[in-house]
A protein has these predicted regions:
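Conserved P-loop NTPase
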Residues: 88-130
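P-loop NTPase motor core
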Residues: 1-100
Length: 130
């Protein structure tokens, strides 16, 4: 919390469940209370509630259920600007990676964005299979 007060452009949380569990255990809170506290903290910093008055963007890594559903409360879904899923076309070493948005308030939904991490230091991407 004090670290965030400095002000950042972007913060990566890996993973939402892990951080939520840590907050819950450290404070002796219920899961719901810890989640509300985290969401309120993110909302505060998204609205520039920090020393540098930066509108902080948060990237939260969140697991999916075995059925492929979002694991978390509806409040997380509601406060999220965009939800992207990293997936594979095919199986094995040659399966192509892609990103697909299931929710995106500022762009398209449902388009597969293929990407490659094979060239060190570069991320290549395309809307068509490479």
């Amino acid at each position: 919390e004090m670290s965030l007060d400095q002000g950042f452009d972007i913060v990566l949380i890996d993973s939402w469940a892990e951080v939520n569990d840590m907050v819950q255990e450290e404070n002796g809170w219920t899961r719901k209370k810890a989640e509300s506290w985290l969401l309120d903290l993110m909302d505060k910093h998204n609205k520039a509630g920090n020393e540098l008055k930066k509108h902080t963007a948060f990237i939260n890594i969140q697991q999916m259920t075995k059925g492929g559903d979002f694991a978390g409360s509806n409040r997380i879904k509601h406060m999220t600007t965009a939800m992207a899923h990293l997936k594979f076309d095919g199986r094995g070493r040659d399966a192509q990676r892609y990103l697909i948005f299931s929710k995106n308030r500022r762009g398209d939904v449902g388009d597969k964005i293929y990407f490659s991490l094979f060239r060190p230091g570069n991320v290549e991407y395309s809307f068509e299979q490479v």
